[in-house]
Regions:
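A charged, aromatic-enriched C-terminal amphipathic alpha-helix characteristic of glycosyltransferases
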Residues: 330-356
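Short alpha-helical segment that forms part of, or immediately flanks, the ligand-binding pocket
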Residues: 257, 279-284, 298-299
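Aromatic "clamp/platform" in nucleotide-sugar-dependent glycosyltransferases that forms part
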Residues: 271
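Conserved catalytic-core segment of nucleotide-activated headgroup transferases in glycan assembly
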Residues: 176, 190-197, 201-244
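Short hydrophobic beta-strand element within catalytic cores of glycosyltransferases
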Residues: 288-291, 301
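Conserved acidic donor-binding segment of nucleotide-sugar-dependent glycosyltransferases
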Residues: 215, 250, 303-314, 322-328
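Short alpha-helical donor nucleotide-sugar binding micro-motif in glycosyltransferases
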Residues: 258-263
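Membrane-proximal helix-turn-helix segments that form the acceptor-binding/catalytic region
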Residues: 122-124, 131-163, 171-172
Length: 357
């Protein structure tokens, strides 16, 4: 079986890229031939993947804002360049589109059996306040395109034989929003062998702290974390700067494993997630997660077993203070690790294969 995986942009630190790469690794381990196709992938990252025996075929080495606008508005240039790459390689039996940006590629009636896996965020991009803030003054124009964008996507997904989502929550939402039945979900695969408890590097347990992922100060959770940092020690992975919290910046995967492992608890970085890589990776490292009781967090976290689910910001702060004052049973760390197995590379790749057969 030969499988082609399509992603708009393969880049270090991207959840979409991790999905494509880890799924490819799992499929190869199961004896499948896999090619990754991307509109953009840097030469350095392509070389890194080659050392992992993964081949990426890409049109360009750097994504631009113009490219993003083209993708948002379904530019034929994006699709035509991707198809040139695909047609110049050996045909695949199956193609999996992982990027919402590439959903319209089947307008060209390509051969093979095609699957689309929705990660939710791009289709509902115009409801994402962080995105709209970053792309001001285009906000009003982008919001005006929301309904027409959904209608285009509703038409285009009808070209796919298989419709999947990255969580049960996403499956439910996208089935409703796009008015089509998404048949199943496949969790984004996490390298649970790599993300496991470790106590090395500079992130030693000199103090208990809560860990949170915040790319920058435009993230919706910044205000909440500001309040939390007044009460308990907080470390931030990302570039956000908050008084009272320690910003680690962008760190390597090795240091990320140690940051997770040494944290007393990880805070879910969003009030609503289609899937939380930070949550899955933290659980894999044996560190419980606290998050809002909505979105995919509900299917990832079992309250008082591998973490905690809260309804409000006040409840989040209160529970964190309680955790830091009284701790929790060590069995929660063991339960966290066990619960992460359903996100493993093996679990996700085998489920994908079974859904195709």
């Amino acid at each position: 079986m030969r499988i082609g995986i399509l992603s708009f942009n393969i880049a270090d630190g991207s959840g979409q890229s991790r999905f494509a790469i880890n799924l490819s690794r799992g499929l190869i381990k199961e004896g499948k031939n896999v090619s990754i196709f991307a509109y953009s992938c840097s030469e350095e990252y392509a070389e890194k993947l080659q050392s992992m025996e993964l081949t990426v075929f890409s049109y360009k080495t750097k994504i631009s804002k113009i490219d993003l606008y083209r993708a948002i508005f379904d530019s034929s240039k994006v699709f035509s360049e991707m198809l040139k790459i695909i047609r110049n390689t050996e045909p695949c039996d199956y193609y999996l589109v992982l990027s919402d940006e590439l959903i319209g590629i089947l307008s060209y009636k390509e051969k093979g059996e095609w699957a689309y896996l929705s990660q939710g965020d791009f289709t509902l991009l115009f409801l994402n306040q962080s995105f709209l803030d970053n792309y001001f003054p285009y906000t009003y124009f982008l919001k005006c395109r929301f309904v027409s964008q959904l209608m285009r996507h509703q038409r285009k997904i009808l070209n796919y034989k298989y419709l999947f989502a990255n969580s049960k929550f996403t499956q439910t939402v996208m089935s409703f929003v796009l008015n089509t039945n998404f048949t199943d979900f496949i969790y984004p695969p996490v390298d649970t062998e790599y993300f496991r408890r470790s106590f090395k590097s500079n992130y030693g347990k000199e103090e208990s702290y809560a860990l949170v992922m915040l790319r920058n100060n435009a993230e919706p959770m910044v205000g909440t974390i500001q309040q939390i940092a007044k009460k308990i020690p907080v470390k931030i992975v990302g570039e956000a700067k908050i008084n009272g919290a320690i910003t680690l910046g962008r760190i390597s995967d090795e240091d990320l494993v140690n940051a997770y492992s040494n944290a007393l608890v990880t805070i879910g970085p969003s009030k609503q997630e289609f899937f939380g890589y930070a949550t899955a990776e933290s659980l894999s490292c044996g560190t419980p997660v606290i998050a809002f009781k909505r979105g995919a967090s509900v299917e990832m976290i079992e309250h008082n077993q591998n973490g905690w689910l809260v309804d409000t910001q006040e409840e989040l702060l209160s529970k964190l203070v309680e955790i830091f004052e009284h701790g929790y049973d060590i069995s929660m760390r063991e339960a966290a690790r066990r619960s992460a197995e359903k996100f493993s590379i093996s679990a996700s790749s085998n489920k994908f294969i079974n859904l195709l057969q």
